[in-house]
């Protein structure tokens, strides 16, 4: 065997070794970057409190009897003592028209006190997601279908808007007069004119609605979207920017709004729209100082 043949064989051997090493590194990257975080999340979810609603209320009816409405966003106005609830504006996905509005609802969810018919002001609005109010009484809402956050007064008149991709959850931060906005991939802190001041990368399947706990510097957000399995409540520590699961909600299958009032976690479900495991538009109430676990659930 001549020297050139030996060199070629040696070169081929090194190339094969290099290809093997690259393939091995790619596998390590996939395991480290994709699989291990999912395993960690699954382990964290298993450690969470698994809770059931202490009380469940049907949403009040609007146009149709015994259906409620398609709830999409929840805000408690402690000054007025009413809930502001987004209404996607149609009962089923195949309905032809959207009539998105904000419903003003009694604390016990018995009746709708009034509404803000946003669809009359904004022709291109296809739905509403999150809803919140700032300290001056004006309203902010996520118009997911338009990729906008809209700012309106209590009569629905436009004050302004800014563009943001796929906004779903929103909360006003009265400490800084800014907004926290959850999208499919990020949690943003924005000024009222839409300038992003802080970005936190978050990508949990089905992340959607949020609530800000100013006292403890925590964001709560909902996740999970298969409509027949568990849903989750996560927290984000705004000091460390770390997200972690807090509760597994065993009986909320179509979450479309969350808030905490007097140690009660209110969770809106639009199960009728999604044909969920519980196909009812309702609010599930979880008493955080008397949590209902699987062992004592009736």
Residue ranges and their predicted role:
Residues 57-67, 116-124, 161-165, 200-205, ...:
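Surface loop/turn motifs at the tips and blade-to-blade linkers of beta-strand repeat domains
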Residues 85-96, 141-145, 179-185, 221-228, ...:
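Conserved beta-strand positions in repeat-built beta-propeller and related beta-rich domains
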